[in-house]
Amino acid sequence: MYGEDSLADSIGLTGYSVDGDGIGGVLKSRIADFRVDEISTSVKIDPRGRFTVANITLTNWETNRFVGKLAKACGISRNRIFFAGTKDKRAVTKQIFVIDAPQKRVAKVEMTDVEIEILGRTHQKIGFGNHKGNRFTIVVRGCCDENGQPIGAKEALERIDTIKQSMEEKLGNGLFPNWIGPQRFGSGRPVTPIVGREVINNDWESAVMTYLTLEGDENEEVSNFRKHVRENGITQEGLDIIPHWLGFERDMMRHILEKPNDWVGAFRRLPNNLQLMTIHALQSVVFNKTIKARLDNDISLSTPIDGDIVGRVDDNGQLETSTMVAVESRTLERISRNCKLGRLAITGQLPGTSMMKPKGEFSEIEKSVIDSMELSQTSWRVEEIGRLTTKGTRRAMVTSFQDFQFEEVPIAGEETMGEKWKSGVKDGELWHPDGACIRFRFTLPSGSYATTLLREFMRVPLKQL
């Protein structure tokens, strides 16, 4: 077992599905080492359509910030740009965007590390999660053992195969725990669930100040800015020293300087999807802790028990939440068989105002997680911004990975590596520059996280993912 990880603790991402020795290593040593290709649902092209459809490749762009820049370049509101999901930042990502702007205007946009391929026009918007899945090609560099000593490719490949076989025996073929990955919470700065807690408590000043001041794994310029605001509040001086790329923080501060005490208005300066993400992030911590609690109680994630809530899994690997049912003793055998075949999945809680709840032993486990997080008295209603009120839902506790391949790749030259690699191994990290490099290829359904699958094989602190 690898060392304690405070980031993992804060988002509930602790423990593993099976025992075993990981391969260590680090992700994203080079931007090209992490590639995501979205498997899009078909968008019907119509020359008379209102919207422009484009396949856009981003290199080292955070999705929300790119959308803001694209909106400005097109002269439109960011709310007129539609996409199916946010992707990893330090990566090469390719996905569909639907843009409410003339095709010629979009075609003229030129941005660094952005390739825009115009596909045509459409009447059809796309929404969050409106894609089939993602294909990943990811290189893990610097493999090592639990003591930080380098391991070769043969040893690394054997460890991967051993863990994969153990997961198949425990969970089923091609299944892994459906943990919600660190990027949902703000990689390196898990601010969103903390802000989300303040939002559902209707404490808007704390929500804004937390977003502005919570420190994470950021550079010195950003840390100094956050420290200044934490110690001095929102001032013109703080606005003057804000790093230019922190556009959301700048907008929030300007709003308060112009309209003192309008904390709800300041929070609204965040993009709508990021506002909602704060609520989803808090729900996600609950879900991750629920997976861990079920594992700790030695209850299978893939074989149901009496009282569980199960739902149908469609052909794209998505849970159909509208038809979930409770497991009863008379249906247990049939449901177990369908879970084993991948047709049904056991679900865990994403709490809200009216979420369907299990019964029996798992009900007590879910309640204990809510109690431990001091959320038992929470209504999940957000009066000032009603669209942030959530009914709650449930999420499959395991998900599938397909087309899984892993192989050795050569160690890359030092000159091609990023700063994370060049700065060397830091205290608490588990990788070694002389260790083997392994390339993984696999496909995941929409809403599942590559980092949480690789975490099962690497077993490293989250800052290495």
Regions found by a protein language model. Name each.
Residues 1-45, 51, 59-64, 73-441, ...:
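Extended, charged/glycine-rich binding lobes that contact polyanionic ligands
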